[in-house]
């Protein structure tokens, strides 16, 4: 049995397509999105609509409040529990989403062997506060391989890599290689030509704003959720917060959401290119009906192996 992971950049059309595919093969969707796990964050995370969720059951959506901690290790554990439930009911589980870290946790396993040390983390954060950029330089010196995989702006993962090195004397990149992978999955990546994808992103952002994204953010803030939460730094939310703070006008806010989403989509595509055996489909050139037929056959065939 091999389960499909259907990944790809934001706004490529994963949800709409896979709801139709899964509906026709008696499958259920396991969301692979690190933002759709949060309650109350519906518009800005482009969650499946109630109608789509009624047509095909979705798992790993609305499981946490915005201030709750979560990581890829917990995602793997919880999503595999959902898979067990789906299998018991005789259905096919299909992972759908664009969070590359979650895909890695499933396919490559995840290293979680060194407990967090808040004292070390506090020291590292303070060091970075006093000398911005110093942690990146330390990572490049102590673990060059990890530095090539961790984005320069990803302070959280940089601190984790340094924390592991400081506690064990070993590089996190080495420890991760010792983590066993999982051969129960195969990866399908949906993509589009850049002009097509960027146009879809721009139109999606316009729809989000029309649907009430600003009011959604206001409501979250009024519920007591801090702008400093990791969840509230999601693209779309952080720009609205800065707009509400008067840092720029409405038009600039919309422009920044579109630009930052386009940059994010580009990073997602780069991430999924790391999977050598992934099967790619370009939705700009393939008809929806033709692709639906191909995906249904591919998912069912691999699941039956």
UniProtKB/Swiss-Prot annotation:
Q: Which residues bind ATP?
A: 8-15
**Where is the site Interaction with substrate tRNA?**
99, 121
The record's annotation in InterPro entries points to: Dimethylallyltransferase, IPT, P-loop_NTPase
Molecular function GO labels: ATP binding; tRNA dimethylallyltransferase activity
Q: What is its EC number?
A: 2.5.1.75
Q: Which UniProt keywords apply?
A: ATP-binding, Magnesium, Nucleotide-binding, Transferase, tRNA processing
Q: Which SUPFAM superfamilies match?
A: P-loop containing nucleoside triphosphate hydrolases
The top EC class is: transferase
Q: Which Pfam families is this protein grouped with?
A: IPPT
Which residues are recorded as binding substrate? 10-15
Query: Where in this protein does the record put region Interaction with substrate tRNA?
Result: 33-36
| Catalyzed chemical reaction(s) | adenosine(37) in tRNA + dimethylallyl diphosphate = N(6)-dimethylallyladenosine(37) in tRNA + diphosphate
Please give the biological process terms from Gene Ontology that the record holds: tRNA modification
What is the top-level taxon of the source organism? Bacteria
Q: Which cofactor does it need?
A: Mg(2+)
The UniProt entry, under PANTHER family, shows: TRNA DIMETHYLALLYLTRANSFERASE
UniProt family annotation = Belongs to the IPP transferase family.
Entries under HAMAP family matching the protein: IPP_trans
* Record NCBIfam families: miaA
Oligomeric form and interacting partners: Monomer.
State the function annotated in the UniProt record: Catalyzes the transfer of a dimethylallyl group onto the adenine at position 37 in tRNAs that read codons beginning with uridine, leading to the formation of N6-(dimethylallyl)adenosine (i(6)A).
List the protein's name: tRNA dimethylallyltransferase
Q: Which organism is it from?
A: Thermotoga neapolitana (strain ATCC 49049 / DSM 4359 / NBRC 107923 / NS-E)
Gene behind this protein: miaA
């Amino acid at each position: 049995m091999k389960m499909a992971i259907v990944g790809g950049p934001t706004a490529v059309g994963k949800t709409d397509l896979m709801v139709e595919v899964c509906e026709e093969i008696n499958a259920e969707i396991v969301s692979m999105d690190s933002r759709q796990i949060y309650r109350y964050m519906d518009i800005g995370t482009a969650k499946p609509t109630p109608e789509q969720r009624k047509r095909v059951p979705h798992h790993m959506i609305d499981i946490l409040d915005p201030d709750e901690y979560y990581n890829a290790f917990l995602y793997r554990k919880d999503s595999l529990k959902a898979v067990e439930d789906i299998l018991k009911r005789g259905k096919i589980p299909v992972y759908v989403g664009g969070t590359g870290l979650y895909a890695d946790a499933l396919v490559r396993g995840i290293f979680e062997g060194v407990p967090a040390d808040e004292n070390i983390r506090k020291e590292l954060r303070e060091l970075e506060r006093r000398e911005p950029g110093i942690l990146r330089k330390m990572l490049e010196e102590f673990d060059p391989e990890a530095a090539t995989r961790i984005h320069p702006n990803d302070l959280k993962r940089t601190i984790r890599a340094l924390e592991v090195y400081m506690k064990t004397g070993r590089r996190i990149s080495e420890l991760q290689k010792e983590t066993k992978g999982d051969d129960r999955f195969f990866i399908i990546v949906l993509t589009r030509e850049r002009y097509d994808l960027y146009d879809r992103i721009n139109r999606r952002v316009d729809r989000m704003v029309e649907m009430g994204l600003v009011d959604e953010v206001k409501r979250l803030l009024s519920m007591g959720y801090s702008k400093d939460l990791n969840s509230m730094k999601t693209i779309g939310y952080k720009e609205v917060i800065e707009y509400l703070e008067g840092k720029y006008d409405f038009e600039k806010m919309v422009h920044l959401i579109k630009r930052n989403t386009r940059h994010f989509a580009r990073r997602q595509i780069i991430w999924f290119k790391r999977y050598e055996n992934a099967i790619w489909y370009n939705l700009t050139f393939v008809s929806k009906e033709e692709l639906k037929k191909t995906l249904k056959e591919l998912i069912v065939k691999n699941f039956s192996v």
